[in-house]
Amino acid sequence: MFLFLCLLFPLGFFIWARSNDDGALRFLPSVFLGVFVSAVFCAFKFFFLPFYYLPQDSFFRNFFHIFCEYVFAPLLAMAILCFLIERREDSFSRFENFFPLCAGFYAIYLPFRILNGRLPIPFFLLFAKPVICFSMILAASKILVALFEKRRTNIMDNSKKIFLSCALAFALLFPAVLEAAWMVGANAVLTVFLTLAYLAFAAGFSVIDK
């Protein structure tokens, strides 16, 4: 039952890497760095911050917690790592390592947070949330790569920059919106439909410029 949760990000990375001209080997150091950072972070939380969040009746409180814990803090850390490790002059974007870093991080972080939470574990957390988080890093990485592509950043027209910026905001905000709505009793069928729609959105952005 837990295999999907534990294997989605590793398998997703290798599928992503096969579509990349450089293959998986070039990005494995970034994956392992993401895994290492995640393991250190999870160990710190386990020993020093053994805190489990109890869903609130307030949509906005739930949204704020989910966004900070699962989106803002992890992705900010991975973005900083991107800028620290991206030194090669021939790299096509400042964020080309963003997806492998995030895949490594969430491969440890998400199972750790979910499996150390409440029991029994709801279907949403075991299946929908991993899909949502994977879709988020897939879409966000592709959009960031396009926004910060070194070859064309200076010639990209403003309308495309605005479109990509809005798409990035949506990609980052929607996961917390959907989970917060689920916490306050959103319709299960609607939740599944929106999860699949978000996956389709991410898949669409994963093939931009191809």
What are these model-derived regions, one by one?
Residues M1-K210:
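Hydrophobic alpha-helical segments at protein termini of multi-pass membrane proteins
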